[in-house]
Amino acid sequence: MPSLMLSDKKEEKKMKKKMALDTPELDSKKGKKEQKLKLSDSDEEESEKKKSKKKDKKRKASEEEDEVKSDSSSEKKKSSKKVKLGVEDVEVDNPNAVSKFRISAPLREKLKANGIEALFPIQASTFDMVLDGADLVGRARTGQGKTLAFVLPILESLVNGPAKSKRKMGYGRSPSVLVLLPTRELAKQVAADFDAYGGSLGLSSCCLYGGDSYPVQEGKLKRGVDIVVGTPGRIKDHIERQNLDFSYLQFRVLDEADEMLRMGFVEDVELILGKVEDSTKVQTLLFSATLPSWVKNISNRFLKRDQKTIDLVGNDKMKASNSVRHIAIPCNKAAMARLIPDIISCYSSGGQTIIFAETKVQVSELSGLLDGSRALHGEIPQSQREVTLAGFRNGKFATLVATNVAARGLDINDVQLIIQCEPPREVEAYIHRSGRTGRAGNTGVAVTLYDSRKSSVSRIEKEAGIKFEHLAAPQPDEIARSGGMEAAEKVKQVCDSVVPAFLEAAKELLETSGLSAEVLLAKALAKTAGFTEIKKRSLLTSMENYVTLHLEAGKPIYSPSFVYGLLRRVLPDDKVEMIEGLSLTADKTGAVFDVKQSDLDLFIAGAQKSAGSMSLEVVKVMPKLQEREPLPQKRFGGGGRGNRFGGGGGNRFGGGGGRGRGGSGGRGQRY
């Protein structure tokens, strides 16, 4: 009972409160009725009533407006939420998102840690096929992620897929995976990927390549590994030493197959692939940037008949990377050492640069002429090469000068610029060299220097499906302007505390020089930027203090000797002999050549004396020139008198007493 009484009292209190709240409304209604009666008796009260109504209308209108605003703002919030949800939906629906594939949690976490949230097209296109056990030929442009296209599905298959039950376990186990690559540098990088991703799944790998200790490699194989990555030569050696057993092999991969052909590994690769007794029990994957006939032959011989092919290049004429800007600049060998630093300044954008030269001698001499660069070629000891490559990857120096040995072994996202000292004779080599930049979604620049008289630039354009931008060498005055801007920024950064120490010298210079403050400051900036003079640079050969002239004879010109004959009629022989880079125009109506800046007036005056037999003018825009393919060179050679850099005490990049000639001396080397 007490509880009932208590609740009744509470209810009573609630009722009283409710009545108290309702009463003002009733009272106000009652008051309004009384007010109406009173207002009918008085005009004054009537006017008051009208005013009151107006106020009520304004108040109601204001309230309605607030409601509309409130509704519209809430609608905006709803719509903005819808927009955000829409964006999120788009991100989730990315068909190449890692979450869309059968990738286990440890691998997903590792990919996320490396900033990979979606697979590249070649990876996405091949993942399910490889994981489901199909033999595959994969083709994509250089730098498009072919390595992870086989690393990820192979690892998943070994741990969670079809290969798990067949994998041998324990000490001394035979490998389940064999990966062949053309260079030790590339082999080490692929092995590093298997270590990084496979390590998270408890799988072990080893890398076998020449130059590394046999006993160390043999020890790893004896203890047992799941994955073997290596170069054909060293893999073949271990097979002959009976260190490799392919009885439990489930995957064999040929990466950069086209490059193995180019580097002469055909017999080794075929021998290694033939060591698998029952190829029907092994899944074979072949990845390549191009598909020459040997690669197609290998796929027909060693892959199953129901093999799959994923070709992301197809009939597209563009075989080289489409994220790379391709530039061709005419250059005389003697101008190269001075030109290359300016090219780096113009096109590297603060990133790293790789310079490719054709021989070890070129690499050594050029790296010695470029500040802060390092050399990489086949005669450098392996241990030093590894230190050099590690330093380049870690950004300890910005410029690497290399032979083709490094072309396929570097996968560094920050390489912004590739410079090739001359067009390679093989188009595939150009594709792979230029592919060292513009990787992993980045953009890059590939500059090719060429001799305008003998060049394979047009052939590369045709076969690689690219279009070169034919540009003149960066002119020193352009470089100076850029350097002046950088110097000005450095001046602004000078701490105010050091200014008083230089004020006296500045005042004295201003008073005694007879120059304006503006001119003095410009000279100071020039000195800071490293310029004490600006030399003109030829459009034809890029040589400093030379100017390019265009000769026309009013009739077709079929040979350089005709041009020399015209010039000798009006000019001294010694001056004619000193012209550089004589080339005929593509339309056969003229020729271009370089003369020293100091001889320009002499040549122009000579043309005026020719009685109209020829005309000469300074070239502003280079006309299209006839090209001559360079003569084929033997793979081996060397020795002899002088060298290709200029012979006779000088070098190729800075002149010298005479032209070097290869002899019939010692045997050359591959790199």
Curated annotation (Swiss-Prot):
Residues 636-671 have a biased composition (Gly residues). InterPro entries: DEAD/DEAH_box_helicase_dom, DEAD_box_RNA_helicases, GUCT, Helicase_ATP-bd, Helicase_C-like, P-loop_NTPase, RBD_domain_sf, RNA-helicase_DEAD-box_CS. Pfam families: DEAD, GUCT, Helicase_C. A motif (DEAD box) lies at residues 255-258. Its EC number is 3.6.4.13. Residues 339-479 form the Helicase C-terminal domain. Residues 50-60 have a biased composition (Basic residues). The keyword Hydrolase applies. Transmembrane segments: none annotated. Residues 26-41 have a biased composition (Basic and acidic residues). It is an enzyme of class 3 (hydrolase). It comes from the Eukaryota. Residues 1-84, 627-671 are annotated as: Disordered. One of its GO terms (cellular component) is nucleolus. A motif (Q motif) lies at residues 96-124. It catalyses: ATP + H2O = ADP + phosphate + H(+). Residues 127-309 form the Helicase ATP-binding domain. It is found in: Nucleus. GO terms for biological process: RNA metabolic process. ATP binds at residues 140-147. GO terms for molecular function: ATP binding; ATP hydrolysis activity; DEAD/H-box RNA helicase binding; RNA binding; RNA helicase activity. Keywords: ATP-binding, Helicase, Hydrolase, Nucleotide-binding, Nucleus, Phosphoprotein, RNA-binding. The modification Phosphoserine is found at residues 40, 42. Belongs to the DEAD box helicase family. DDX21/DDX50 subfamily. The Q motif is unique to and characteristic of the DEAD box family of RNA helicases and controls ATP binding and hydrolysis. This is DEAD-box ATP-dependent RNA helicase 7. It comes from Arabidopsis thaliana (Mouse-ear cress).
